[in-house]
From Swiss-Prot:
Keyword Membrane among record annotations: no
Pfam families per UniProt: SAICAR_synt
CDD domains listed in its UniProt record: SAICAR_synt_PurC (cd01415)
Organism: Streptococcus sanguinis (strain SK36)
The protein, known as: Phosphoribosylaminoimidazole-succinocarboxamide synthase
One GO MF term: phosphoribosylaminoimidazolesuccinocarboxamide synthase activity
Metabolic or biological pathway: Purine metabolism; IMP biosynthesis via de novo pathway; 5-amino-1-(5-phospho-D-ribosyl)imidazole-4-carboxamide from 5-amino-1-(5-phospho-D-ribosyl)imidazole-4-carboxylate: step 1/2
Enzyme Commission code: 6.3.2.6
Length: 235
């Protein structure tokens, strides 16, 4: 297999494969926060992220969610369908936390009657600004129909994920998804799902996600290992 580096991101390197419709994602031992302002190498993080994301994507595939995930091929590597990434971060919030609490001046941990879906424009130079549907259309990122699908699919994924995490005693506070167009022009779930891009709290309100790194609350890999071990009990 000939692997040429196509893209180096904060958490993963993306390589070509012998199949032009398939890419290899290699998870890094790097933790970043605040758009890369805080950065640290943490041994074992790449393995844990690959394990967790592969597990979740396998379950999503089995539940009928169309994703880019093909399979885990090593401790740090997985094969994915090549997609044209939509430059949006789709965030769903089940509880108030993080930037939402700061933006609206509310305390963290308030359950939202209806989960809220938000869009953020993927642009590092602009610090990934919060945008609405009209901005998405103005920037020609997605049509009305595509926007509606992104929201509907994110809500469907939320129901699945919330149920799975509830089974193992964790609250899914919020999460970020990315989507892309496959070779047939179909929108499918891409990127990853791990404690890097979601918030998980246990019954005592302890953070079981990257906030441990953001806020200096403990050892990141210890927390991710607990999440990985708990995931084995999901039915």
């Amino acid at each position: 297999m000939s692997n040429k580096l196509l893209y180096s991101g904060k958490a993963k390197d993306i390589f070509s494969t012998d199949d032009e419709q398939v890419i290899l994602a290699r998870y890094k031992d790097q933790a970043t926060a605040f758009n890369g302002v805080k950065k640290e190498q943490i041994a074992g993080k790449g393995v844990l992220n690959n394990q967790i994301s592969s597990f979740i994507f396998e379950k999503l595939n089995a539940a009928g969610v169309a994703t880019h995930f093909i399979g885990k091929v090593s401790d740090t590597d997985q094969l994915n369908k090549k997609v044209e990434i939509i430059p949006l971060e789709v965030v769903l919030r089940n509880y108030t936390a993080g930037s939402f609490s700061k933006r609206f001046g509310v305390e963290e941990g308030i359950a939202l009657e209806t989960p809220i879906v938000e869009f953020y424009y993927k642009n590092d130079d602009l610090d990934d600004p919060f945008i609405n549907d009209e901005h998405v259309k103005f920037l020609k990122i997605a049509s009305d129909q595509e926007i509606a699908f992104l929201k509907e699919e994110t809500r469907r994924i939320n129901k699945l994920l919330s149920d799975w995490f509830r089974q193992i005693g964790l609250k899914l506070i919020d999460f970020k998804l990315e989507f892309g167009f496959d070779k047939d022009g179909k929108i499918i779930l891409a990127d990853e799902f791990s404690p890097d891009n979601c918030r998980l709290w246990d019954a005592e309100g302890h953070h079981m996600d990257k906030d441990v790194f953001r806020r200096g609350l403990g050892e990141l890999t210890d927390v991710y290992q607990v999440v990985w071990e708990k995931l084995q009990a999901i039915k």
